[in-house]
Amino acid sequence: FIQDTETYRLSMGLETKIADWDVSAYFIWAQNKNVTTTKGLLNTGNIKKALSGDACTGSCVPLNIFGGQGSDSKYIGDGLWTGTGSITPEMVEYITFLAHDTGENEMKNFGFDVSGELAQLPAGPVGIAFGYEHRKEEGGYEPDAFIAAGLSSGNAASPVSGEFEVDETFLELAIPVADGLDLSASVRYSDYSSFGETTNAK
């Protein structure tokens, strides 16, 4: 098989200072596309037609897997041949196909965070950081039409796609208790489109 993959990525970031606060923001976009080409898979629908004897008409190419397809061959009806020979290129072309499977994934991610000093205590400044992040991921797979229809000798496959989004916020505190001793605390809230909300603290 042959696989052709294209990958794209865009990343942007910004860092600045507003008053005494450090602010940063970012945006990331990424996409992956691939096409998988597989040669030599059998078209089971055409095989049935080719082996159907007198019912193989029109564009159908008759096939006798037991031989009798050489230059001296003669079709005598009811799926029977006389003569010698082997399967011809025309027969192979009729009962095989070139499969094209496609897949794609895309991700979008953006957010910001702010950090600075919230207050001054005898032991030092109280540090704080908070921020927000959004991420969306989606993807899909599209098998070849013959494979999706169950007309292939390869593994069966069906089209599939899906996506999820998540929004997250966080808050972190660093509180000086004494010289060289800090008390830290943090909490993160996440809201997933796939299964709901979670809150984690430490």
Which role does the model predict for each range below?
Residues 156-162, 182, 197-200:
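A structural preference for long, well-packed, hydrophobic secondary-structure segments
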Residues 181-192, 201:
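Transmembrane beta-strand segments that form the barrel wall of outer-membrane beta-barrel proteins
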